[in-house]
Regions:
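Core of compact, soluble alpha-helical bundle domains
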Residues: 2-153
Length: 153
């Protein structure tokens, strides 16, 4: 009797690890989504962010809806998917196309910095371990800089 595994055998999954189907089979390591606490983490992060956006004189007018709830929901879905959680964003809205979706709005360095300031409130409130905080903030900062489409004040 041999203890060799057959290539089609499914790996043993540790408790608390959620496998997602990937191009080459199920993922076998926890995703960032799992590491930070999943949906509840992203819901709180995004809610804290939108509390600031709701009163921001530069950012709030960029949202066509008076109620920021739908925008909050979309951002939660996007971040969950980006970080390895459910693919609900793409299922409901298609490819994220972040730059294209932001073209109608004047995103200048001031708007970028305001966006980052409100997001920093949520990130700070999350009290993440330094590694996860650094990974998250690096992405948010790069994404914010990439959305700039105007240098007009």
């Amino acid at each position: 009797v041999t203890s060799e595994r057959h290539p089609t055998d499914q790996p043993t999954v540790p408790a608390g690890v959620h496998l997602r189907e990937a191009e080459n089979g199920p993922a076998v390591v926890p995703t960032f989504f799992d590491e930070v606490g999943g949906t509840p983490f992203f819901e709180k992060l995004v809610h804290d962010f939108y509390v600031g956006v709701a009163t921001d004189p530069v950012l709030k007018p960029m949202y066509p809806e008076d109620d920021l709830g739908p925008a909050e929901h979309r951002l939660v879905m996007f971040l969950e998917q980006f970080w390895g959680g459910p693919g609900t964003y793409s299922e409901q809205r298609g490819h994220p196309r972040l730059r294209q979706r932001h073209v109608p709005f004047k995103v200048n360095p001031d708007a970028r910095d305001r966006w980052l300031g409100h997001m920093k409130v949520g990130v700070d409130a999350a009290n993440l371990p330094p590694l996860q905080r650094g990974i998250l903030w690096d992405y948010l900062e790069r994404a914010a800089f990439a959305m700039v489409n105007s240098f007009d004040e």
